[in-house]
UniProtKB/Swiss-Prot annotation:
Family stated for the protein in its record: Belongs to the DNA mismatch repair MutL/HexB family.
GO molecular function: ATP binding; ATP hydrolysis activity; ATP-dependent DNA damage sensor activity; mismatched DNA binding
Database matches in Pfam families: DNA_mis_repair, HATPase_c_3, MutL_C
PROSITE patterns documented for this protein: DNA_MISMATCH_REPAIR_1 (PS00058)
Name under which the protein is recorded: DNA mismatch repair protein MutL
GO biological process: one example: mismatch repair
Alphabetized PANTHER family for the sequence: DNA MISMATCH REPAIR PROTEIN MLH, PMS, MUTL, DNA MISMATCH REPAIR PROTEIN MLH1
Cellular component aspect of the GO annotation: mismatch repair complex
Keyword terms of this UniProt record: DNA damage, DNA repair
Keyword DNA damage: yes
Alphabetical list of NCBIfam families matching this protein: mutl (TIGR00585), PRK00095.1-3 (NF000950)
Length: 657
């Protein structure tokens, strides 16, 4: 008897499912992509228990005949390709013919479908890949696929599932990516009867961005475009002031397919040059139209990894598109920015209207670079965003519509902005630390610091608005003013955050913090870490938290940016301990809130900074390890000016004169 046997189709499909179906979000991705390939304009995704109990995809696509419905459950049966040459010019999202039979082999699947030409529809019920029921039914044009009890016959896979909120966050992320890739399709995502995501399907990408990431984010996105003989690039990227703590908000699309590509991500950052803070990443949605012959999507069953010919040329095209678009906007030069810091002023905050982005009546006007509400949506006019009062960030009392369903906007509530609170308090540091390994080492190093004597310094000057000059018994001292203030602020924040207790300051005007659906769910799951540092956020409608009081160690003017920074850090470091979280938070806050280079300090401010530095436990290094000051002794100065020389014998003594 031969040792090598041909595996049964069911077993082969279950093996394939190990690659195709990693988690419930994989099922959503494959089925929604099939719906898009079928020409659907409306797709509804309904899940229960984050997809483990139920996933139902309903579309209004072209549907399937009874014969095609049966064939669709067979391995490598597809309508997308018919010959070998088709494999090199793929324009559809699916083509392998593996997804549907793989999903059916590990679940209870029900398919209800009908074509426009067909007089009747077809109902198929399959369990573990075997068709148990087939009958003729009445059905509208389109397809409805119901997947129940996922992994029922492969229970080992369930051990690797994360929490329900985590799995739901993955589903939301997939739906968001597909919504950005296909703004012409109206997507609706419902979890346990609650609507999570809804897009209008108007075909406007910027409107889709507003529906997913929020209106404030969409208004800070700039359009990019570029093209050559091989590639055509279009999309939106965020202004340098709008960043996130990770790359998860970068969406790359090739011919409508969401992909992951490290080099193309790198080209996006290169397009910003030095405009981004180290450790921060932009929001970007970039669609790349490419000849299918130049892209090989048949690399992995998930089809998220794509090999691209002329990849270097494409990288250059993306970088150029971003840099050229940024040049068209008034990004304030450092000199003017520092000049503005001589006077204390508050930064105007973008105003959030009280209209829910989840409703389909929101439209984007390219000519005016603004959003508006369709006449068929409301009966009375709503004030233009730019005409709203910006003095206190409050919303006009006449606006009646609620930002979130079930939550009424109060004139005494501010919408928090991710804008940096005051340009004087932020620094574009090249030494920002985000690596977990480096952070661990740094925490140990900072914890082991010991107090040391610091010389008495007498300030007498400043150079280039960057370095302070002082003298002491040890000679001349040159101090890096940014590093000095960074050290002072780090020790302040480390001490204050370490003293977190129940002492809270009531906010006169509460703040609202808006997040994407996936971030909102993850923050809810990790809320205890925020509470450990004295931040108590309460859910307030869809994807929104309200902050009614802040910890006393955080200044009120730092609340908006500080809360967003802590949430970003929490999302970036999934299982971080409170100790590491506080250390990283203190490093980050001290870095961003220290004075920049080319900032002139008056005598009082300079002396006060040196006095504060003298009180630090370690005044010699900033939190990143760079030196705060250097010393030139009197002997060093005399050597440089050749004042220390060997004894000379005079020429007169030698009898020359």
């Amino acid at each position: 008897m031969s040792k090598i046997i041909e595996l049964p189709d069911i077993l082969a499909n279950q093996i394939a499912a190990g690659e195709v179906v990693e988690r419930p979000s994989s099922v959503v991705k494959e089925l929604v992509e099939n719906a898009i390939d079928a020409g659907s304009s409306q797709i509804t995704i309904e899940v229960e228990e984050s997809g483990l109990k139920k996933i139902q995809i309903t579309d209004n696509g072209e549907g399937m005949t009874s014969e095609d419905a049966v064939l669709s459950l067979r391995r490598h049966a597809t309508s997308k390709i018919k010959s070998q040459s088709d494999l090199f010019r793929i324009r559809t999202l699916g083509f392998r013919g593996e997804a549907l039979p793989s999903i059916a082999s590990i679940s209870l699947m029900t398919i209800k479908t009908a074509t426009e030409q067909g007089k009747q529809g077809t109902l198929l019920v399959a369990k573990g890949g075997n068709i148990e029921k087939q009958e003729v039914v009445s059905s509208p044009r389109g397809t409805k696929i119901l997947v129940e009890n996922l992994f029922f016959n492969t229970p080992a896979r369930l051990k690797y599932m994360k929490s329900l909120q985590s799995e739901l966050a993955h589903i939301i992320d997939i739906v968001n990516r597909l919504s950005l890739a296909h703004p012409e399709v109206a997507f609706t995502l419902i979890n346990d009867g609650k609507e999570m995501t809804k897009t209008s399907g108007t075909g406007d990408l910027r409107q889709a961005i507003a529906g997913i990431y929020g209106l404030n984010t969409a208004k800070k996105m700039i359009e990019i475009s570029n093209a050559d003989l091989d590639f055509e690039i279009s999309g939106y990227v965020s202004l340098p002031e709008l960043t996130r703590a990770n790359r998860n908000y970068i969406t790359l699309l090739i011919n409508g397919r969401y992909i992951k590509n490290f080099l193309l991500n790198r080209s996006i950052l290169d397009g910003y040059g030095s405009k981004l803070m180290v450790g921060r990443f932009p929001i970007a949605v970039i669609d790349i139209q490419i000849d299918p012959y130049l892209a090989d999507v048949n690399v992995h069953p998930t089809k998220q990894e794509v090999r691209i010919s002329k990849e270097r040329e494409l990288m250059s095209l993306i970088s150029t598109a971003i840099s050229e678009s940024l040049k068209q906007y008034d990004l304030i030069p450092d000199a003017l920015e520092n000049l503005a810091k001589t006077s204390t002023r508050s930064v105007d905050k973008p105003i959030q209207t009280s209209f829910s982005l989840k409703q389909p009546g929101l439209y984007y006007d390219r000519a005016k670079n603004d959003f508006f509400i369709g006449a068929d949506t409301v009966s009375e006019p709503i004030a233009n965003f730019t005409n709203l009062d910006k003095s206190d960030g409050s919303v006009d009392n006449d606006v009646k519509n609620s930002v979130n369903q079930g939550a009424t906007q109060s004139p005494n509530i501010k919408y928090a902005s991710r804008d940096q609170a005051d340009s004087e308090n932020f620094i574009h540091s090249q030494d920002y630390l985000s690596s977990k390994q480096s952070l661990n080492k740094l925490v140990e190093k900072l914890d082991s610091e010991e107090s040391s004597t610091f010389p008495e310094l007498e300030f007498f000057g400043q150079m280039h608005g960057t370095y302070l000059f002082a003298q002491g018994n040890g000679g001349l001292y040159i101090i890096d003013q940014h590093a000095a203030q960074e050290r002072v602020k780090y020790e302040y924040y480390r001490e204050k955050i370490g003293e977190v207790d129940n002492s809270l300051q009531q906010l006169l005007v509460p703040f609202l913090f808006e997040f994407s659906s996936s971030d909102f769910l993850q923050l809810q799951e990790k809320m205890s870490l925020l509470q450990d540092v004295g931040i108590f956020l309460e859910p307030y409608g869809n994807n929104t938290f309200i902050l009614r009081e802040h910890p006393i160690w955080m200044k009120e003017e730092e609340v908006e940016s500080g809360i967003y920074e802590m949430c970003d850090m929490l999302l970036l470091t999934n299982e971080v301990s409170v100790k590491k979280y506080r250390a990283e938070l203190a490093i980050m806050m001290s870095c961003k809130r220290s004075i920049k280079a080319n900032h002139t300090l008056d005598d009082y401010s300079a002396r006060h900074l040196l006095d504060q530095l003298a009180q630090c436990k370690n005044p010699y290094n900033c939190p990143h390890g760079r030196p705060v000051l250097v010393n030139f002794t009197k002997a060093d100065m005399e050597k440089m000016f050749k004042r220390i020389q060997e004894n000379h014998t005079s020429l007169r003594d030698l009898g020359k004169y």
